[in-house]
A protein has these predicted regions:
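An acidic, low-aromatic, low-complexity terminal/linker signal
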Residues: 1-180
Length: 180
């Protein structure tokens, strides 16, 4: 590098004013918040789990039945990557009919916290998605009543709107399933 290319060039009045104006503008304090979700399909329905609440997504595993537990939503317990998780039928908890298709695309979405994990089988997980909070809409009243309490809003996706899962409400319902 030559000495001439290292010396700063003098700024003309117009460039100086443009840079001064750019630095004088206040920094945007409230940027558009992106909501990151894990998109999943159960039957023909698309659902979105808040990515921050998803511990992991793995290939589907066969759970081990829990003796003396008869609630149809409790599928059993499974060892998922070295951690025991209660496997719960998402559709049964939410009040709609669905049977896992299985196959190569089937996945387990694991929610909760370490030591208190809950796994849900889904037909597929195409990936994660970042959505502007402004693009999310409230769940319409037409969302069927049995599982309306588990949907906190709708997330626009290329597959159509996906129901954003209220993880706290879902896990509270799952705890009730285990107790019965």
């Amino acid at each position: 590098m030559s000495e001439a290319s290292r010396t700063p060039r003098p700024l003309d009045a117009q460039t100086l004013q443009q840079q001064t104006d750019a630095f004088a503008r206040p920094v945007e304090t409230q940027r558009k918040q992106d909501v990151h979700v894990v998109l999943a399909r159960i039957g023909s329905s698309w659902i979105a789990f808040p990515a921050a609440r998803v511990l992991r997504v793995t290939t589907a595993v066969v759970p081990h039945r829990v003796p003396h537990r008869r609630h149809r939503a409790l599928c059993g317990l499974a060892n998922i990557e070295g951690e025991i998780a209660a496997v719960v039928d998402f559709a049964s908890v939410c009040g709609f009919d669905w049977s896992p298709a299985g196959g190569a695309r089937a996945r387990m979405v694991v929610l909760g916290e370490r030591g208190s994990a809950w796994a849900f089988e889904v037909d597929e997980v195409p990936g994660t998605l970042a959505v502007s909070a402004e693009d999310m809409v409230a769940a319409p009243v037409t969302v069927s009543t049995p599982h309306a309490g588990f949907t906190s809003g709708l997330v626009p996706t290329e597959h159509g709107p996906a129901g954003m899962v209220d993880v706290d409400a879902l896990l509270t319902a799952c705890e009730g399933v285990v107790r019965t």
